[in-house]
């Protein structure tokens, strides 16, 4: 099952905690991320964690080698605009959700979004539907 992983979940991967183990398990599956997630991940590690750039590059390269990484696209952006209105999402969260849905992921793992929310793309009988799950919630 393809699963999209949000930045706020991946950040725990660099921690020495039980949550890091959960992220390792998610990455061992058919994990999908987007370039947006890579950018946000690098930004948080540099700005909030004060991690050295070579270490950030190693972690990002590992993600690139481990996950299916989606490029940003106009279609994703346009879909995100619709999802913003439908689900009251920020532009950044809507782009994450759009990327996950357009890549046929069944689940989007996120700590910040509404756990259990079922998201459907616009259009008649859209096959592109996914559920948002918090992987740290028991």
What are these regions (language model features)?
Residues 1-34, 48-58:
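Short, well-structured N-terminal submotif of metal-dependent ribonuclease cores
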Residues 8, 42, 112-114:
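Anionic group-transfer/hydrolysis microenvironments
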Residues 26-28, 64, 125-127:
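Short, well-ordered coil/turn elements that cap or connect secondary structure elements
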Residues 40-68:
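Active-site-proximal, substrate-binding regions of enzyme catalytic domains
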Residues 68-111:
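Active-site neighborhoods of divalent-metal-dependent phosphate/nucleic-acid chemistry enzymes
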Residues 97-98, 102-138:
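Acidic, PIN/NYN-like endoribonuclease modules and their adjacent C-terminal/linker elements
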């Amino acid at each position: 099952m393809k699963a999209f992983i949000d930045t706020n979940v991946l950040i725990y991967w660099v921690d020495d905690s039980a949550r890091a183990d959960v992220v390792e398990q998610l990455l061992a599956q058919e994990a999908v991320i987007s370039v947006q997630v890579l950018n946000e991940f690098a930004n948080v590690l540099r700005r909030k964690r004060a991690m050295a750039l070579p270490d950030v590059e190693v972690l990002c390269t590992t993600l690139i080698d481990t996950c299916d990484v989606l490029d940003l696209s106009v279609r994703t952006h346009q879909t995100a605009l619709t999802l913003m209105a439908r689900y009251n999402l920020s532009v950044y969260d809507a782009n994450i959700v759009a990327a996950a849905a357009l890549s046929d992921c069944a689940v989007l793992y996120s700590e910040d979004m509404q756990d259990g929310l079922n998201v459907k793309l616009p259009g008649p009988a859209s096959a592109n539907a996914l559920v948002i799950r918090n992987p740290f919630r028991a």
